[in-house]
Amino acid sequence: MNYFFSLVLVFLVLSVVVLGVVSAPYQGVVALMGVSFFCCIFMVFLGRTFAALVMYIVYLGGLVVVFGYCVSVEKESGIYSVGGTKYFIVCVSLLLVVLLCLLREVGGLLVYVNWGDLVCLEMNGVGVFYFSGGWGLIVCSWGLLVVLFSILVILSWSRLGGLRPF
């Protein structure tokens, strides 16, 4: 179980590294989907299954809207590839860190003894989101709306509106 948990965390870090390296928006979409997926898997390991499902649906909904619009108005047709010495050094450094952690058997960082404390966190389910978690969902949806309008302003949506050529 701890090995699978550490594998999920390694994939989470790798997807964040890929997100920092890519230069095309549609490649960033795939990297962000990976980050959100592995974060939700991490939440499932901690016993927050319903929260992980709701956050994954909310996050992917906002992600599809924002980056769907970004990709539709993208004017460049060139495909960028990830290469060069900078990316090679980053990948080799990350590989060395992972190997050092594995050789030292992770050093007990991923070992949590009291799993009994985290077992019954999902008893309330939807009731928690409507009562005390509702404000969190409102803040998340407000953040997605702010990101959507900032992307629209960055892409200068007021110049052409719906009359832009595809």
From Swiss-Prot:
Annotated coiled-coil segments of the chain: none
GO cellular component: mitochondrial membrane
InterPro entries, A to Z: ComplexI_Subunit6
Catalytic activity from the UniProt record: a ubiquinone + NADH + 5 H(+)(in) = a ubiquinol + NAD(+) + 4 H(+)(out)
Enzyme Commission number(s): 7.1.1.2
Keywords: Electron transport, Membrane, Mitochondrion, NAD, Respiratory chain, Translocase, Transmembrane, Transmembrane helix, Transport, Ubiquinone
GO molecular function terms attached to this record: NADH dehydrogenase (ubiquinone) activity
Similarity-based family: Belongs to the complex I subunit 6 family.
Name of the protein in question: NADH-ubiquinone oxidoreductase chain 6
Organism: Lycodon semicarinatus (Ryukyu odd-tooth snake)
